[in-house]
Amino acid sequence: MPAAIETDSLTKSYGDTTALAGLDVSIPRGEVYGFLGPNGAGKTTTMRILTTLTTPSGGDAWVMGEHVTDRDAVVEHVGYLPETPPVYDELTAREQLTYLADLRDLDAAQRDRIDPLLERFGLADAANDPIRTYSKGMRQKAALAGTVLQDPDVIFLDEPTSGLDPRAARTVRDLVADLADEGRTVFLSTHILPVVEELADTVGMLANGRLVAEGAPADLKRRAEASAEAGLTGSDSASDPTERTLEDVFLSVTEDHAWHGKSAESEG
C-alpha cells in the first residue's frame, strides 16, 4: 500500500530564490504529520505542490499513490484549508457548502454530508445566517467543513488555529483530532507548537527548504537533549529532558543544523 504522502528530491524555485531544496518525506496513511518551519522555510509551497496548486521545479511527489502532475486524480483524495480560507460573506454556511458541492461536482452521498457536518462543527443553529455575521471561530469552522465535505483521505491544514481565541482554537483542535481518529491523514502546518505537540504522530522541521529534523515529538526531544549534552547545540535549552518542549527543539535545530534527521542524506 503506498504512503499517503511521499516526496522524492522535491524542489521549487522562484527565479533565483529556492523555496524547496530536495524534500524527501514519506507519511503513512492515518498519521498526523506536523510540519514546522520559520517563515519562508517552504511550508506553504510544499502544501501547494501536494494539492496540485503549484508545479514543482524538480523531483516527484505522490498523494495516495497519485502523482501530483495528475491533478484530477489527486484532488479526489485531498482537502486543503489555506491560512486565509475562502469564505463567502453573503452566503450562509449551508449555501456555501452547497456551492462547493456544485463546484466540485460531488455525488449525492457527499452532498448528504452537508447537514451532518453543520451539526458536527457546531454551525447547525446558524446554518442559515450569512457568514458575514459569524465570529472568526465560526468562519474557520465553516471553512473546515468545506475542506472535508468531499470526505477526503488526506487533509492539508495551514495555520488552522491562527488568530482564534482560546475557546475557538480548542474547538478546532478537537475537530482535527476527531478527523485523525477516523483514520484520515492530516498534514498540519502551524506556528503554535503546543498544537503540534498535542496532535502530531510525527513532526518534520523545515529550514531553508530542507528537512532538518523528523521524528515523533518525544524522540526529537530525546535527540536534542543528547546533542545538547554532547555540546552540539546551544546551551539555552532545558537541562531536564522531561521539561524540554517542542519549541526548544525547533529553535535548536532551525538555528543550528549540527544535528538533523533524514536531511543528512539529501544534504550530502
Describe each model-derived feature in a short phrase.
Residues G59-D70, V74:
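Conserved ABC transporter NBD signature motif
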Residues T98, D102-A126:
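Conserved ABC ATPase "signature" region
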Residues D151:
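Conserved catalytic motifs of ABC-family nucleotide-binding domains
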Residues I155-E159:
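Catalytic Walker B motif of ABC-type/P-loop ATPase nucleotide-binding domains
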Residues E214-G215:
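ABC ATPase "signature
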